[in-house]
Amino acid sequence: PENMEGKRIFLRFEGVGSYAEVYINGYLAGTHKGAYSAFACEISSQVKFGKENEIIVKADNSSRPDVIPTNHILFGVYGGIYRPVWLVVTETCSIIANDCASPGVYITQKNVSKKSAEVTVKVKVDNTTLTPVPLELENAIYDRNGKLVKKHSQNFELTPQGVQNYSSHFRLNNPHLWQGREDPYLYKVVSRLMQNGRVIDEVIQPLGIRKYEIVAGKGFFLNGKKYPMLGVTRHQDWWGLGSALTNKEHDFDLAQIMDIGATTVRFAHYQQSDYIYSRCDTLGLVIWAEIPFVNRVSGQEWDNAHQQMRELIRQSFNHPSIYVWGIHNEVYHPHGYTAALTQSIHDLCKLEDPDRYTVAVNGYGHADHPVNQNADIQGMNRYFGWYERKIQDIKPWIEKMEKEYPWQRLMLTEYGADANIEHQTEILGDALNWTSPFYPETFQTKTHEYQWSIIAQHPYIIASYLWNMFDFAVPTSKRGSVDARNMKGMMTFDRRIKKDSYFWYKANWSKEPVLYLTQRRNAVREKKETSITVYSNIGTPRVYLNGKELTGVRKGYTDVHYIFDKVVLDDGKNVLKASLLHQGKEYTDEIEWNYNGECNREADFLEHKKEHGSW
């Protein structure tokens, strides 16, 4: 519109995969490298006011040696404009709009306790005119109900052609603390820039007053209280949508994460939508945000890795839910270059944000490897029973780490196994060859049942993150007879089916009542004598087989794990029912199995695949 002439005009892209060129009326307005961070292009000099304007965005998601991730082996890097685009209009003097596409407002906290907290609000103010401009900046803190808590105003003359920083310092007495899922209380900070009494710019940011502390060997503390770090990981893509999600899909994913009882989320392996970080602020999820420095190095990604970390920090700085910045994930070779780049990114994190932790992740299984010596926290990905050794080997590994590295802040940052819900068997070993085309859901369940029980016994593991909350795309692979899919999720790629492992964690983690019979998809039984497993966090269940109550229940790995052994099935149809009266309400679950003689479903699957090439 013509009334915008004389103002500054920006296009703010929340995500374009992964190299973007923005053209306005044939002129190149800006470029950006990286699929996951936002970027802002000023187009003030290219637009025609009061006329039609042509905007062209060229997007290329080909792998490049100078853009992380430098290959697309671990996950799909989707192309195009897949997140919202905003037209931002400001006065010639404004809170900065193009400081790495950040809000331009940075909130820090010091000396946080129940009695008081010190809060500093720094605002970057930009002047593009050729003359000094007298301005007033007001920073105000409001409580959840909109009541003013504190306010500070300052008058100044903004120098021409440049950016200046202005800060307000507050001391809050008896602050209402942000206490995770228990009480995710948020204030809001409103920064107003005024000229001659008129508001010319305003930015609103969340304020959750909290203190994170990690103590080696003891755990994670939130505001001085030990806090359980019950973690899941999340890739953002959906079947049929890729990464082009609306807030509806983000909200659905978060609802499942809340339902399972998680308290912390590792958003892997890249910066995710700012909307989802904001929702974690309001839900009380403690989160880990990271950049896509993964898998391999090219030697040409140094600048871009720093750029993407700087963008992540500045764009996400004010989210109280974020406790750590992730530097890299399983970047193995060459060691010297990787260690140097990790150290440099860590230093950048501390320069940009000295109050949060950093973490680097490897899959080596020992804590003295040089690529992981340059961050505050050691993250380790271990897939016992899947990529290495046996399911049960997690226990001696943790005990060895406790003994040899008691001073380390150590997290188990990935663990689990794939599960194709179409693949089922009762016949399981303690390890599975991940190159096999047969990925039984029951093996994933067995893995998580045992491994979570061991993790829960060891507070040395500061946090654990199961891999993954949802199945996701891996374009270059074929796993478990499915193209381009990693199936380690607790839910399927389309989010329609919750696997048995989902209910294992919900029973162990959630305060919501759970009564669940496992192996409902393993309906064609291979053995006449079998076991029945029930997850119940509301007491000992009563289980019936074809109307007859079973006896001889025993506890499994945790207090929610109930097993009935040596159950003899009838030939043909078998109806299993679990029931339990809890606080005056009856809970039930029912499934159906069929037994038609001894068989081996894995052997049948492999034979059929050999003969027909598919199942």
PLM region spans:
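Substrate-binding/catalytic cleft of secreted carbohydrate-active enzymes
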Residues: 254-257, 264-497, 501-508, 512-531, ...
